[in-house]
């Protein structure tokens, strides 16, 4: 599915929106997906960055909208309103502060992405990495060749190198970046895609309507803050 279908770029890695959960702080709370975050016990303990200036936070926003009914679905936006009411105005200053605050025990759960979450898990930190049961969006990381590149044949060889079995296996086993090759090897903490409920992002829609999506989010967040 994540293949070069346009001729303009080639996907070679996959970025994944996940929830990172502090095990010690959530012993009595079941967290398997987005719906489980709407728990009053988590008020002020949900870490997220600002979707307006964080690509991972924006990916989380569009992921939850897809899962809750769609980008223009009012029920989906009601979910966003309810979730950010529990965030309680505590927006992390950066994407890295999201997973760090959960690892440090400051926050109970964070809206983050797979790479740093798996690094913490591999390092033995007492966290869980949750792939939302409602649906997890996989966004491709792409490589492209510049038009009229001086060394076009070498550029093509480099793309082939990125997609080779050896490099894809190394990505999956020696890093925490998910390879795009279907049969690539992965480390033990990288959950198989066959075990994940995969949701599909309408990338064309999101690109064309990013400003409108962010305006809707910012209006909701501002309204929440005005009432606190």
Q: Can you describe what each PLM-predicted range is?
A:
Residues 97-98, 115-119, 134-137:
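Short, catalytically relevant binding-site loops at active-site mouths
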Residues 35-38, 65, 81, 99, ...:
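Non-transmembrane alpha-helical segments in soluble domains
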Residues 79-85, 91-92, 123-147:
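Periplasmic-binding protein-like
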Residues 1-7, 119-131:
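Ligand-binding "clamshell"
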Residues 1-106:
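Extracytoplasmic ligand-binding site segments that recognize negatively charged/polar headgroups
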Residues 103, 108-126, 175:
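A ligand-binding cleft/hinge motif common to bilobed small-molecule-binding domains
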Residues 136-137, 141-201:
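Mature extracytoplasmic/periplasmic domains
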Residues 188-228:
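Extracellular/periplasmic bilobal clamshell ligand-binding domains
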């Amino acid at each position: 599915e994540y293949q070069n279908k346009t001729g303009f770029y080639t996907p070679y890695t996959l970025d994944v929106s996940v929830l990172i959960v502090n095990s010690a702080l959530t012993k009595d709370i079941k967290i398997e997906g987005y719906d489980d975050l709407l728990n009053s016990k988590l008020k002020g303990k949900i870490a997220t960055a600002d979707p307006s200036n964080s690509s991972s936070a924006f990916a989380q926003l569009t992921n939850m909208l897809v899962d809750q009914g769609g980008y223009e679905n009012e029920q989906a936006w009601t979910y966003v309103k309810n979730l950010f009411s529990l965030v309680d105005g505590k927006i992390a200053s950066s994407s890295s502060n999201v997973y760090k605050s959960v690892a440090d025990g400051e926050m109970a759960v964070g809206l983050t992405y797979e790479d740093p979450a798996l690094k913490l898990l591999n390092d033995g930190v007492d966290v869980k990495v949750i792939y939302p049961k409602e649906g997890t969006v996989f966004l491709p990381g792409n490589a492209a060749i510049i038009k009229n590149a001086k060394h076009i044949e070498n550029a093509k060889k480099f793309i082939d190198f990125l997609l080779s079995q050896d490099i894809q296996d190394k990505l999956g086993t020696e890093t925490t970046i998910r390879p795009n090759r279907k049969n690539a090897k992965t480390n033990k903490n990288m959950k198989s895609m066959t075990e994940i409920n995969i949701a599909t992002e309408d990338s064309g829609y999101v690109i064309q309507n990013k400003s409108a999506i962010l305006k809707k989010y910012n209006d909701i967040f501002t309204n929440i803050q005005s009432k606190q």
